[in-house]
Design a protein with these regions (language model features):
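Conserved ABC ATPase signature
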Residues: 64-68, 72
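Conserved ABC ATPase "signature" region
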Residues: 31, 35, 42-60, 112
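A short, proline-enriched helix->beta-strand linker immediately N-terminal to the Walker B motif
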Residues: 83-87
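Short coil-to-helix segment of the ABC ATPase nucleotide-binding domain corresponding to the Q-loop/switch region
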Residues: 24-31
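Catalytic Walker B motif of ABC-type/P-loop ATPase nucleotide-binding domains
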Residues: 89-92
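Catalytic "switch" loops of ABC-type ATPases
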Residues: 16-21, 127
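Hydrophobic anchor residue at the start of the ABC signature
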Residues: 78
């Protein structure tokens, strides 16, 4: 049982869907995980307010999920994910259902939060552009049975901006390299 608690304190998981509690405000949702863990009210509120501001939701703290766009709800979920302070974040296609513009914005928000807090992030995505832009390495998996077929180092420095990277020739070279690995894996 103790090992489960240790694991729960070490890893935070962010879903593709926001999974917000509809009866809680943006602030209430952002501090939910820390509340469950027993963090003092003042401390969890301050942390949640700081993160809501960082994800661009200052002024929406008292809004309920039904009043927020899908992108705003994902921002709340991102704030909730970081609020726990876990050293490892598992993110399963967190921006997959967003429109292209909102997705780019949230990718930059995530990079900014990472730059500030330096967490280990395992980011699952089917979007090669997202993988190349945000990662330090891209692990390419084969189709069934899933196995690692390539480990591609991404050599961009930090801090970085997704939109700025996508204009660089090296970005396109890495994208092509990852795409070639993926094609090879699909043909096996």
């Amino acid at each position: 049982m103790a090992s489960r608690r240790l694991l729960a304190a070490t890893i935070t998981y962010m879903l593709a869907r926001d999974a917000l509690a509809p009866w809680r405000t943006a602030l209430g949702n952002a501090e939910l995980g820390t509340e469950v863990r027993g963090v003092a009210a003042e401390k969890r509120r301050a942390r949640a307010l700081d993160l809501l501001e960082k994800v661009g939701l200052k002024g929406f703290e008292d809004a309920y999920p039904k009043a927020l766009s899908h992108g705003m709800r994902q921002r709340v979920a991102l704030a909730r994910t970081f609020s726990l302070g876990s050293p490892i974040l598992l993110m399963d296609e967190p921006f997959g259902a967003l429109d292209a513009q909102t997705k780019l914005q949230l990718e930059d928000v995530l990079l900014s939060l990472w730059q500030r807090e330096r967490r280990t992030v395992l980011f699952i995505t089917h979007d090669l552009s997202e993988a190349v832009s945000m990662s330090d390495r891209v692990i390419v998996m084969s189709s069934r049975p899933g196995r690692i077929i390539a480990d591609v180092p991404i050599t961009f420095g930090r801090p970085r901006s997704v939109r700025a990277l996508q204009k660089e020739a090296h970005y396109h070279e890495l994208y092509s390299q990852v795409w070639s690995c993926l094609e090879e894996g699909l043909s096996q």
